[in-house]
Amino acid sequence: MDLFDKCHNYTEAKEAIAHGIYPFFIPLTDNEGTEVVFKGHRLIMCGSNNYLGLTTHPKVREAAIEAIKKYGTSCTGSRFLNGTLELHERLESELAEWVGKEAALVFSTGMQTNLGTVSALIGRDDRVILDKDDHASIVDGARLGYGRIERYNHNDIDHLERVLVSIPETAGKLIIVDGLFSMEGDLADLPRIVPMAKRFGARVMVDDAHGMGVTGQGHGTAAQFGLTKDVDLIMSTFSKSFASLGGFIAGDEPVIHYIKHHGRALIFSASAPPANIAAALAALEVMRSEPELIQRVNDNAEKMRKGFQELGFDTGASQTPVVPIIIGDNDKTFLAWKMLFDAGVFVNPVISPAVQPGRQLLRTSYMATHTDDQLERVLEIFSRVGRKIGLIP
């Protein structure tokens, strides 16, 4: 058998392209934040993670431009060698303070943050315990480690307890959860997870890629529950509320120091470019100086949740700016996506394995910079499309 046979036999995506219902890798010709353009077709963007709308904020843009002028376009090296600027260390210091931890470590992407952190910490005699809805980067980081992976049903703390009971007391244990689950917009049940972890001698890591800047007055999901000091590690990315690219892990200084010297995804990757680091720093400053943006994005999300529910859509357990429209069928999910796209609304169709079978959905997400007129227009188009294909009465 030829290794490439599977490549030549893979036809699903090409069939979707031929039928005009391929929803991925859409090349936008303009991106103004809340609105985008594809081949001259203007759409309201309800599929972005730009929660605070900071990609177009003047202070963030200017910081990136000035960093390029001062440092150039790239560090052309690993953080471990020549790729660390004072900007990186300044950002690490400010992030640690923002999330209430002793130290932080900046990686080049969020994916690399999880790959480097989890694989560095999990050894042969250790167990990593994952929520079944955890992000793929957490799963891949766990696979790169030499320990054993255990999984429990989504936010099912009774199942988590059974898993912990089954693990030998001698094993090191790390529970990893998304703070804000990225597909359905619900929050990890940290008020129950944290005391259970303490009971079994397990450490807790929260991947707050989607929660940072949104929950806990911007400080994240652990802060929202008053558990910042009780959570051992807090991870986030810069590609959402921070309007940039990169990621970080924060925790006690000895732990961060260890990851710094054992995280292969950090050591063997080029460092995040100056513009990205400067943009993230500026975004953090905007979060401090303009907290009304954090309130605004949550107000917009509540408006849309209520609007969708009044129309008859199922928004699941969403509590955040990620608001799913649960459809439960592949064909209807793609059909709804196509009709919404043609009508001027950009959303993301999500099917298995990204969600469990029967939970296929349209992932919508909202920004602080969406206007009331834009949001009303989105509800109007959803109402029309939903009725046309039988999603709502």
Predicted regions and their residues:
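N-terminal "arm"/small-domain region of PLP-dependent enzymes with the aminotransferase-like
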Residues: 5-73, 202
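Conserved PLP-binding catalytic core of the aspartate aminotransferase-like
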Residues: 295-302, 309-344, 354, 358-359, ...
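Structural motif of enzymes handling amino- and sulfur-group chemistry
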Residues: 271-290, 296, 300-305, 309-311
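Conserved PLP-anchoring active-site segment centered on the Schiff-base-forming lysine
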Residues: 117-136
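Active-site phosphate-binding strand-loop segment of PLP-dependent enzymes
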Residues: 150, 154-206
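Active-site PLP attachment segment
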Residues: 223-258
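PLP-dependent enzyme catalytic core of the Aspartate aminotransferase-like
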Residues: 3, 58, 62-66, 70, ...
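Conserved N-terminal alpha-helix of the aminotransferase class I/II PLP-enzyme fold
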Residues: 62, 66-110
